[in-house]
Amino acid sequence: LPVDPIDARTFRRKVLLDPNFDPSGLIVARDAGEVVGFCLCLVRRVPLEKVGMEPERGWITAFGVHPRARRQGIGSALMEGALAWFRQTERREVAIAPYTPNYFVPGVDVEAYADGLRWLTERFGFEVVARPLSMDANIVRFDPAPYAEREAALRAAGVRCEPLAPTAIPEFIAFMQAHLPGDWVRHARELLLDAARGHAGYDQILVAWLGEEVVGYCQFDGEHFGPYGVRSDLQGKGIGTVLMVRCLQAMRERGLHHAWVLWTSDETAQRIYARFGFRETRRFAVLRKRW
Protein backbone atom coordinates (compact mmCIF):
# COMPACT_ATOMS: atom_id res chain seq x y z
CA LEU A 1 0.00 0.00 0.00
CA PRO A 2 2.55 2.60 -1.17
CA VAL A 3 0.33 5.66 -0.68
CA ASP A 4 -1.05 4.54 2.71
CA PRO A 5 1.92 3.90 5.02
CA ILE A 6 1.34 3.48 8.75
CA ASP A 7 3.67 3.20 11.72
CA ALA A 8 3.66 0.63 14.52
CA ARG A 9 1.72 2.93 16.83
CA THR A 10 -1.09 3.32 14.29
CA PHE A 11 -1.12 -0.43 13.70
CA ARG A 12 -1.56 -1.11 17.40
CA ARG A 13 -4.26 1.54 17.79
CA LYS A 14 -6.28 0.74 14.68
CA VAL A 15 -5.77 -3.02 14.48
CA LEU A 16 -4.56 -4.77 17.62
CA LEU A 17 -6.60 -2.59 20.00
CA ASP A 18 -9.73 -2.43 17.89
CA PRO A 19 -12.54 -4.00 19.95
CA ASN A 20 -13.60 -6.07 16.93
CA PHE A 21 -10.15 -7.40 16.07
CA ASP A 22 -9.92 -11.18 15.82
CA PRO A 23 -6.42 -12.56 15.11
CA SER A 24 -7.96 -15.26 12.91
CA GLY A 25 -9.21 -12.49 10.60
CA LEU A 26 -5.70 -11.19 9.91
CA ILE A 27 -4.72 -13.55 7.12
CA VAL A 28 -1.00 -13.52 6.34
CA ALA A 29 1.04 -14.99 3.48
CA ARG A 30 4.67 -15.93 4.16
CA ASP A 31 7.55 -16.97 1.96
CA ALA A 32 10.47 -18.59 3.77
CA GLY A 33 9.22 -17.06 7.00
CA GLU A 34 8.94 -13.55 5.58
CA VAL A 35 5.56 -11.82 5.33
CA VAL A 36 4.75 -11.13 1.67
CA GLY A 37 1.03 -10.41 1.86
CA PHE A 38 -1.91 -9.90 4.18
CA CYS A 39 -5.65 -9.29 4.34
CA LEU A 40 -7.34 -7.72 7.38
CA CYS A 41 -10.92 -8.94 7.88
CA LEU A 42 -13.31 -7.68 10.54
CA VAL A 43 -16.79 -8.45 11.85
CA ARG A 44 -18.44 -6.80 14.81
CA ARG A 45 -17.85 -8.39 18.19
CA VAL A 46 -19.24 -5.35 20.03
CA PRO A 47 -22.10 -3.15 18.78
CA LEU A 48 -21.57 0.25 17.19
CA GLU A 49 -23.61 3.03 18.74
CA LYS A 50 -26.94 3.55 16.94
CA VAL A 51 -26.06 0.74 14.49
CA GLY A 52 -25.74 -2.46 16.47
CA MET A 53 -23.93 -5.64 15.49
CA GLU A 54 -24.62 -5.70 11.73
CA PRO A 55 -24.66 -9.51 11.87
CA GLU A 56 -24.69 -10.10 8.11
CA ARG A 57 -21.85 -7.70 7.23
CA GLY A 58 -18.07 -7.93 7.30
CA TRP A 59 -15.25 -5.65 6.17
CA ILE A 60 -11.84 -5.79 4.58
CA THR A 61 -9.96 -2.68 5.70
CA ALA A 62 -6.50 -3.38 4.31
CA PHE A 63 -5.04 -5.79 1.78
CA GLY A 64 -1.70 -6.03 0.06
CA VAL A 65 0.99 -8.18 -1.52
CA HIS A 66 4.67 -7.25 -1.63
CA PRO A 67 5.62 -6.07 -5.16
CA ARG A 68 8.19 -8.82 -5.67
CA ALA A 69 5.63 -11.50 -4.73
CA ARG A 70 2.85 -10.39 -7.05
CA ARG A 71 1.43 -12.38 -9.96
CA GLN A 72 2.15 -15.65 -8.20
CA GLY A 73 -1.38 -16.31 -6.98
CA ILE A 74 -0.73 -15.00 -3.47
CA GLY A 75 -3.31 -12.23 -3.69
CA SER A 76 -5.96 -14.62 -4.97
CA ALA A 77 -5.20 -17.11 -2.20
CA LEU A 78 -5.47 -14.36 0.41
CA MET A 79 -8.78 -13.10 -0.96
CA GLU A 80 -10.23 -16.60 -1.22
CA GLY A 81 -9.17 -17.22 2.36
CA ALA A 82 -10.79 -13.96 3.43
CA LEU A 83 -14.09 -14.77 1.75
CA ALA A 84 -14.04 -18.24 3.31
CA TRP A 85 -13.46 -16.65 6.73
CA PHE A 86 -16.48 -14.38 6.25
CA ARG A 87 -18.64 -17.34 5.25
CA GLN A 88 -17.50 -19.22 8.35
CA THR A 89 -18.61 -16.25 10.44
CA GLU A 90 -22.02 -16.38 8.70
CA ARG A 91 -21.68 -13.11 6.81
CA ARG A 92 -23.68 -12.46 3.66
CA GLU A 93 -21.97 -9.25 2.61
CA VAL A 94 -18.38 -7.97 2.55
CA ALA A 95 -17.42 -4.33 2.07
CA ILE A 96 -14.09 -2.70 1.21
CA ALA A 97 -13.35 -0.58 3.24
CA PRO A 98 -15.96 1.60 5.05
CA TYR A 99 -15.59 0.00 8.47
CA THR A 100 -16.08 2.03 11.62
CA PRO A 101 -14.50 2.84 13.97
CA ASN A 102 -11.02 2.14 12.61
CA TYR A 103 -10.99 2.29 8.84
CA PHE A 104 -7.79 3.50 7.17
CA VAL A 105 -9.34 4.90 3.99
CA PRO A 106 -12.93 4.91 2.67
CA GLY A 107 -12.24 2.39 -0.09
CA VAL A 108 -9.80 1.53 -2.88
CA ASP A 109 -7.90 4.52 -4.28
CA VAL A 110 -9.02 4.49 -7.91
CA GLU A 111 -5.75 5.98 -9.18
CA ALA A 112 -3.07 4.55 -6.92
CA TYR A 113 -4.53 1.03 -6.91
CA ALA A 114 -6.27 0.92 -10.29
CA ASP A 115 -4.98 -2.58 -11.07
CA GLY A 116 -6.17 -3.90 -7.72
CA LEU A 117 -9.59 -2.33 -8.20
CA ARG A 118 -9.99 -3.97 -11.58
CA TRP A 119 -8.81 -7.29 -10.14
CA LEU A 120 -11.35 -7.15 -7.30
CA THR A 121 -14.27 -6.35 -9.60
CA GLU A 122 -13.40 -8.69 -12.46
CA ARG A 123 -11.84 -11.61 -10.61
CA PHE A 124 -13.92 -11.65 -7.42
CA GLY A 125 -17.15 -9.96 -8.41
CA PHE A 126 -17.04 -6.94 -6.11
CA GLU A 127 -19.26 -4.06 -7.21
CA VAL A 128 -18.57 -0.35 -6.78
CA VAL A 129 -21.34 1.14 -4.61
CA ALA A 130 -19.92 4.64 -3.97
CA ARG A 131 -17.07 6.89 -5.07
CA PRO A 132 -16.25 9.22 -2.16
CA LEU A 133 -13.37 11.67 -2.26
CA SER A 134 -10.81 13.20 0.07
CA MET A 135 -10.21 16.95 0.02
CA ASP A 136 -7.56 19.33 1.31
CA ALA A 137 -7.44 23.11 1.74
CA ASN A 138 -4.68 25.60 2.45
CA ILE A 139 -6.18 27.81 5.17
CA VAL A 140 -3.27 30.20 5.70
CA ARG A 141 -5.11 33.04 3.96
CA PHE A 142 -8.63 32.03 4.95
CA ASP A 143 -10.64 35.19 5.71
CA PRO A 144 -13.71 34.89 7.95
CA ALA A 145 -14.72 38.54 7.45
CA PRO A 146 -17.13 37.93 4.51
CA TYR A 147 -19.25 35.72 6.78
CA ALA A 148 -19.65 38.21 9.64
CA GLU A 149 -23.04 39.45 8.41
CA ARG A 150 -24.36 35.91 8.17
CA GLU A 151 -23.30 35.17 11.73
CA ALA A 152 -24.90 38.43 12.91
CA ALA A 153 -28.16 37.48 11.16
CA LEU A 154 -28.14 34.12 12.91
CA ARG A 155 -27.62 35.78 16.26
CA ALA A 156 -30.56 38.06 15.55
CA ALA A 157 -32.63 34.93 14.86
CA GLY A 158 -31.59 33.43 18.19
CA VAL A 159 -28.78 31.15 16.97
CA ARG A 160 -25.33 31.54 18.49
CA CYS A 161 -22.18 29.61 17.55
CA GLU A 162 -19.47 29.19 20.16
CA PRO A 163 -16.86 26.76 21.49
CA LEU A 164 -18.24 23.92 23.58
CA ALA A 165 -18.09 24.57 27.31
CA PRO A 166 -17.42 21.51 29.52
CA THR A 167 -20.63 22.26 31.41
CA ALA A 168 -22.61 21.77 28.18
CA ILE A 169 -21.37 18.23 27.49
CA PRO A 170 -24.70 16.57 28.48
CA GLU A 171 -26.72 18.75 26.08
CA PHE A 172 -24.15 18.24 23.33
CA ILE A 173 -24.06 14.45 23.64
CA ALA A 174 -27.87 14.32 23.75
CA PHE A 175 -27.98 16.27 20.47
CA MET A 176 -25.43 13.96 18.87
CA GLN A 177 -27.25 10.81 19.94
CA ALA A 178 -30.60 12.12 18.72
CA HIS A 179 -29.61 13.56 15.36
CA LEU A 180 -26.29 12.28 14.00
CA PRO A 181 -24.67 8.95 13.05
CA GLY A 182 -23.32 6.72 15.77
CA ASP A 183 -19.75 6.92 14.52
CA TRP A 184 -19.89 10.71 14.74
CA VAL A 185 -21.00 10.34 18.36
CA ARG A 186 -17.93 8.16 18.92
CA HIS A 187 -15.65 10.73 17.24
CA ALA A 188 -16.97 13.50 19.46
CA ARG A 189 -16.80 11.41 22.62
CA GLU A 190 -13.18 10.41 21.93
CA LEU A 191 -12.20 14.04 21.39
CA LEU A 192 -13.93 14.99 24.64
CA LEU A 193 -12.11 12.20 26.47
CA ASP A 194 -8.82 13.57 25.14
CA ALA A 195 -9.86 17.02 26.36
CA ALA A 196 -10.71 15.63 29.79
CA ARG A 197 -7.22 14.08 29.95
CA GLY A 198 -5.61 17.36 28.92
CA HIS A 199 -4.55 16.09 25.48
CA ALA A 200 -6.99 18.25 23.49
CA GLY A 201 -9.15 21.33 23.96
CA TYR A 202 -12.89 21.57 24.45
CA ASP A 203 -12.71 24.47 21.99
CA GLN A 204 -11.97 21.94 19.23
CA ILE A 205 -15.73 21.45 19.15
CA LEU A 206 -17.90 24.38 18.04
CA VAL A 207 -21.62 24.20 18.77
CA ALA A 208 -24.67 26.08 17.53
CA TRP A 209 -27.36 26.90 20.07
CA LEU A 210 -30.96 27.86 19.47
CA GLY A 211 -32.05 29.10 22.84
CA GLU A 212 -30.96 26.42 25.29
CA GLU A 213 -30.84 23.63 22.70
CA VAL A 214 -27.84 22.43 20.69
CA VAL A 215 -28.77 22.35 16.99
CA GLY A 216 -25.41 21.88 15.25
CA TYR A 217 -21.73 21.27 15.74
CA CYS A 218 -18.34 21.14 14.05
CA GLN A 219 -15.08 19.66 15.31
CA PHE A 220 -11.43 19.33 14.34
CA ASP A 221 -8.56 17.16 15.49
CA GLY A 222 -5.25 18.56 14.32
CA GLU A 223 -5.63 19.25 10.59
CA HIS A 224 -8.50 16.77 10.32
CA PHE A 225 -11.63 18.85 9.78
CA GLY A 226 -14.97 17.40 10.82
CA PRO A 227 -17.30 15.73 11.21
CA TYR A 228 -19.88 18.47 11.36
CA GLY A 229 -23.66 18.56 11.13
CA VAL A 230 -26.83 20.55 11.73
CA ARG A 231 -30.23 19.35 12.87
CA SER A 232 -32.15 18.35 9.74
CA ASP A 233 -35.04 20.81 10.15
CA LEU A 234 -32.60 23.73 10.42
CA GLN A 235 -30.36 22.93 7.48
CA GLY A 236 -30.08 25.47 4.68
CA LYS A 237 -30.20 28.46 7.04
CA GLY A 238 -26.47 29.16 7.13
CA ILE A 239 -25.78 27.52 10.49
CA GLY A 240 -23.39 24.98 8.98
CA THR A 241 -21.56 27.72 7.08
CA VAL A 242 -20.95 29.76 10.22
CA LEU A 243 -19.85 26.68 12.17
CA MET A 244 -17.40 25.83 9.41
CA VAL A 245 -16.04 29.38 9.34
CA ARG A 246 -15.58 29.41 13.11
CA CYS A 247 -13.91 26.00 13.01
CA LEU A 248 -11.46 26.89 10.22
CA GLN A 249 -10.58 30.12 12.01
CA ALA A 250 -9.95 28.19 15.24
CA MET A 251 -7.62 25.90 13.31
CA ARG A 252 -5.71 28.90 11.94
CA GLU A 253 -5.42 30.37 15.43
CA ARG A 254 -3.69 27.15 16.51
CA GLY A 255 -1.10 27.69 13.78
CA LEU A 256 -2.44 25.07 11.39
CA HIS A 257 -1.86 25.70 7.69
CA HIS A 258 -4.06 23.03 6.17
CA ALA A 259 -7.39 21.30 6.70
CA TRP A 260 -8.35 17.95 5.24
CA VAL A 261 -11.50 15.88 4.94
CA LEU A 262 -10.98 12.14 4.49
CA TRP A 263 -14.41 11.22 3.17
CA THR A 264 -17.18 13.19 1.50
CA SER A 265 -19.53 12.96 -1.48
CA ASP A 266 -19.41 14.90 -4.75
CA GLU A 267 -22.61 16.72 -3.81
CA THR A 268 -21.24 17.89 -0.46
CA ALA A 269 -17.86 18.68 -2.00
CA GLN A 270 -19.39 21.01 -4.58
CA ARG A 271 -22.08 22.52 -2.35
CA ILE A 272 -19.97 23.15 0.74
CA TYR A 273 -16.27 22.39 0.73
CA ALA A 274 -15.32 23.92 -2.63
CA ARG A 275 -16.57 27.30 -1.41
CA PHE A 276 -13.90 27.23 1.29
CA GLY A 277 -11.01 26.32 -0.96
CA PHE A 278 -11.06 22.55 -0.52
CA ARG A 279 -9.87 20.60 -3.56
CA GLU A 280 -10.03 16.90 -4.37
CA THR A 281 -6.85 15.02 -3.51
CA ARG A 282 -7.95 11.37 -3.74
CA ARG A 283 -10.88 9.40 -5.09
CA PHE A 284 -12.00 6.04 -3.73
CA ALA A 285 -14.22 3.17 -4.76
CA VAL A 286 -16.26 1.61 -1.97
CA LEU A 287 -16.73 -2.05 -2.89
CA ARG A 288 -19.30 -4.64 -1.90
CA LYS A 289 -19.79 -8.34 -2.52
CA ARG A 290 -22.92 -10.27 -1.57
CA TRP A 291 -23.87 -13.95 -1.69
Model-assigned labels for residue ranges:
Residues 2-32, 36-49, 177-214:
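Active-site rim helix/loop that mediates acceptor-substrate recognition in acyltransferases
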Residues 27, 37-41, 58, 63, ...:
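Conserved GNAT-family N-acetyltransferase fold
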Residues 47, 71, 79-156, 285-289:
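Acyl-donor-binding surface of acyltransferase catalytic domains
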Residues 60, 94-97, 225, 259-263:
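Conserved hydrophobic beta-strand within the GNAT/NAT acetyltransferase core sheet
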Residues 60-70, 99-102, 225-236:
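A short, internal acetyl-CoA/4′-phosphopantetheine-binding micro-motif in the GNAT/acyltransferase core
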Residues 65, 71-88, 230, 236-249, ...:
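Conserved acetyl-CoA-binding loop-helix of GNAT-fold acetyltransferases
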Residues 159-172:
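A short beta-loop-alpha structural element at the N-terminal edge
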